[in-house]
Amino acid sequence: MGNEFRMCDDCQATNVKTLIPKLKKVDSCATIEVGCQSYCGPGRKKSFAFVNNRPVAAPTEDELIVKIEAKLNK
């Protein structure tokens, strides 16, 4: 089973337009779903994505990608 990335297009700290291409570079075969993730509190302050049903957050998008890559390489 492939990886799954989920993110919210309404949270203030997450820019879906720039994050999706970066996630595709991490794993081009992953499923990407966009919609409310009920993660509004942290989503106001940090860029986040759910990776295989686990939340990953960071102050910036670039830091988020580094954390996601580390999580997938475990």
Curated annotation (Swiss-Prot):
Pfam families: DUF1450
Signal peptide, first to last residue: none
UniProt record similarity statement: Belongs to the UPF0741 family.
Record-linked HAMAP family: UPF0741 (MF_01863)
Protein name: UPF0741 protein BCAH187_A5562
